[in-house]
């Protein structure tokens, strides 16, 4: 079995590096164990701006965390977008930020790309929503015997690949726990993504367990796609992950900081991005079949 896996590894295709850029992720910092429904959302934006002011960087791409900006629909006409557009121009950098866009009793979890001198270029609305986190299944029934005040609005799902365009070209984007699902990263890579961004938020948790799981998932997605992954979390962990899964740089929890590294924009498919789960399923079937056959032969010879 080990020989089969090693042989497959030797012939597996990979991505090819193209341009090298400087990339940064912004971690606003703050306390753990907080709730979005009872928190000051304006303060989250202010902490992102404060982190940038305290840690000036010369960078080509800057990624902000999930729900770094909260505004009312349409976000395209919001004051907050104007602030970020001006910032992108002043810094001469592409900003990938994440908006919580309130629309009545609903909201959208949207990542946007902002080019300097241009403003909003593209948006991606989160597709894979969190049940009981971003929406309540059977809300009409459950609200009869449960307090749903912390999830007062229902998230509206997006559609399409996890991808946003920018002057740097196509950028993959998976929001929060979408990084746990290979098909969301694959959708962006198949549409041309040369780098993966992952705005996320784990400030509602009181310990490091979920941030560690998120970072581990980002490392897996980096290896599968052979792409750099930029994970920006409001309170950590934020990280820049190399295509081989190595963590180039990582923040501490609750820290206000900006992480910066040289990264490659890469093209090409791996088996994971080209075929999805099929190769793993075939290998698993071969290993199980081989094990069953070996067991049968041992019983016959006994």
Model-predicted segments: where are they?
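Enzyme catalytic cores with a strong preference for nitrogen-chemistry domains
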Residues: 1-302
């Amino acid at each position: 079995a080990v020989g089969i896996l090693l042989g497959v590894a030797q012939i597996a295709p990979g991505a090819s590096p193209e341009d090298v850029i400087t990339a940064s992720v912004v971690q606003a910092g703050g306390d753990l164990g907080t709730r979005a429904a009872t928190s000051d959302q304006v303060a989250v934006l202010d902490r992102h701006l404060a982190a940038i002011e305290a840690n000036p960087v010369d960078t080509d791409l800057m990624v902000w965390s999930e729900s770094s900006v909260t505004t009312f629909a349409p976000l395209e006409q919001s004051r907050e977008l104007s602030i970020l557009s001006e910032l992108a121009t002043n810094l001469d950098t592409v900003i990938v930020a994440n908006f919580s866009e309130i629309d009545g009793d609903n909201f959208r979890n949207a990542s946007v790309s902002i080019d300097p001198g241009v403003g909003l270029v593209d948006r991606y609305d989160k597709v894979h929503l969190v049940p009981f986190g971003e929406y309540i299944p059977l809300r009409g029934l459950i609200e009869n015997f449960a307090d749903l005040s912390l999830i007062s609005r229902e998230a509206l799902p997006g559609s399409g690949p996890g991808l946003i365009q920018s002057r740097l070209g196509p950028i993959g984007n998976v929001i929060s726990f979408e990084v746990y699902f290979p098909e969301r990263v694959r959708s962006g890579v198949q549409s041309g993504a040369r780098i993966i961004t992952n705005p996320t938020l784990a400030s509602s948790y009181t310990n490091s367990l979920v941030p560690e799981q998120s970072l581990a998932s980002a490392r897996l997605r980096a290896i599968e796609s052979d792409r750099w992954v930029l994970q920006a979390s409001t309170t950590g962990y934020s990280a820049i992950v190399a295509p081989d899964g190595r963590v180039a740089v990582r923040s501490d929890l609750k820290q206000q900081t900006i992480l910066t590294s040289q990264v490659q924009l890469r093209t090409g498919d791996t088996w994971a991005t080209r075929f999805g789960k099929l190769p793993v399923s075939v290998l698993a079937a071969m290993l199980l079949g081989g094990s069953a056959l070996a067991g049968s032969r041992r019983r016959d010879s006994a």
